[in-house]
From Swiss-Prot:
Binding-site positions, Zn(2+): 126, 130, 136
NCBIfam families on file: rRNA maturation RNase YbeY (TIGR00043)
Protein family membership: Belongs to the endoribonuclease YbeY family.
Gene name linked to the record: ybeY
Protein's UniProt name: Endoribonuclease YbeY
Amino acid sequence: MVEGEASSPAFTIDYAVATGDWPAEDVLRGLVERAVTAAAARTDGPLQASLSVLFTDDAEMRALNARFRGKDKPTNVLSFPAPDSMVPPGTPRHFGDIALGYETVSREAKEEGKSFEHHLTHLVVHGFLHLAGHDHETEVEAEEMEQLEREILQSLAIGDPYA
């Protein structure tokens, strides 16, 4: 497992590459920082916080999905918002955790004719929006969240992921 830490302007990002044929660490770090910075600029989330990102495989994603969502299958991205808690002044609060499954992300990118990096960026944005309180349980929520994703990705010169 490869672990590290990076900082976007407002977020300290801890990342871990557990398993999978993920791109190089510097590529992942840059991608996550860009996605988080763009998404944070469009949400009402905290001005400063820490965030953890786990890059893993479908086996671990399946286990996490089963344990926390009751769905015994792998998925592309999972988000785990951190509970609101008191933190000392000047200490960034933990915003939450995002987990990504390599095989599913890779397969979806190929099936949808997207670059792996663009699809991964979309999923990091999607996961971040969940941490910020957005959801897609109803049609109205889904439309609002998808539109916000489009706007964030457009700011990163990435096309509409739903087109």
